[in-house]
């Protein structure tokens, strides 16, 4: 943590540690050293799945593990850096910082602590982060890792908190729900009997005002503007606000399960052809 903090301060021009050249030295040298390790590993038949700023994700056969380990130890002696090793049974990667990694031992123990998630697949609520529906990554993880159908996970969940989303709007926006103005920070879930949640701001023009503008090589253009500019905060479904928790049974909440299923399946369909099995 201390090293990460220093690295950030080296590129902060308002910090006394500011040193752009040192940042480039650290990052370029680090990348070149990792590239050297990656090159050595590919020469013995390893496949580099991911190369990040601080490590490599490598796919290899058990028969060449000792050879790969020897290369890593030689690299440590040469660079005076230390490598840490984690073994995985499977990895499902959507983007560079969005993945599910199943650590060695999960298949036998089913210990949830052996599932490592990052980015969009994190199922825990993080302070300071916007709230997204945690049932979606949970359903995706159970589908890939345990073979449980997405519909079973989503429709079998009885915790309304896992369906909740939230959005905070800036001071220039007003929030409107069912023709009533709301607070700027709202918590809601997709429902079949709710209305749309809108945010709007003043455009600076009068209702029906004609605005003219010019484009190069095009004749003068004009359009009619409105006093307010509206944006739908969840276009794919109506919502129900839940800024205050209550004891209503989940069966009575009219959850739009199709919305959550669609969002989960959308990710699965993109991810499935690129999944990596490491057994």
Residue ranges and their predicted role:
Residues 1-36, 42-44, 59:
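Helical catalytic core of nucleic-acid polymerases
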Residues 4, 31-38, 57, 68-76, ...:
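Short, well-ordered alpha-helical packing segments
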Residues 40-41, 50:
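Helix-rich, typically C-terminal accessory recognition domains appended to large enzymatic cores
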Residues 45-47, 79-80:
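Glycine-centered loop/turn motif at secondary-structure junctions
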Residues 54-60:
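A generic structural motif
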Residues 65-279:
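C-terminal, non-catalytic extensions of nucleic-acid polymerases
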């Amino acid at each position: 943590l201390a090293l990460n903090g220093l690295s950030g301060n080296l590129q902060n021009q308002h910090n006394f540690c500011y040193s752009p050249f040192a940042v480039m030295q650290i990052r370029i040298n680090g990348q070149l050293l990792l590239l050297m390790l990656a090159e050595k590993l590919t020469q013995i038949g390893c496949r580099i799945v991911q190369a990040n700023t601080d490590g490599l994700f490598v796919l290899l056969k058990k028969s060449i593990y000792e050879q790969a380990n020897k290369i890593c130890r030689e690299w440590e002696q040469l660079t005076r850096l230390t490598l840490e090793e984690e073994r995985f049974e499977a990895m499902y990667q959507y983007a560079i910082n969005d993945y599910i990694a199943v650590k060695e031992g999960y298949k036998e123990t089913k210990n949830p602590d052996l599932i490592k998630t990052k980015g969009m697949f994190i199922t825990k609520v993080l302070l300071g982060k916007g709230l997204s529906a945690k049932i979606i990554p949970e359903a995706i993880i159970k589908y890939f890792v345990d073979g449980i159908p997405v519909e079973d996970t989503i429709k079998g969940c009885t915790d309304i908190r896992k369906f909740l989303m939230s959005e905070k709007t800036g001071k220039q926006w007003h929030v409107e729900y069912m023709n009533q103005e709301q607070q700027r920070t709202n918590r809601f879930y997709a429902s079949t009997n709710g209305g749309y949640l809108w945010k709007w701001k003043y455009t600076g023009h009068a209702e029906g005002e004609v605005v003219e503008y010019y484009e190069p090589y095009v004749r003068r253009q004009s359009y009619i503007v409105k006093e307010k500019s509206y944006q739908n905060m969840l276009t794919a479904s109506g919502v129900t606000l839940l800024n205050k928790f209550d004891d209503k049974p989940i069966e009575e909440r009219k959850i739009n399960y199709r919305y959550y299923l669609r969002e989960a399946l959308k990710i699965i369909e993109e991810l499935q052809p690129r999944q990596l099995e490491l057994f």
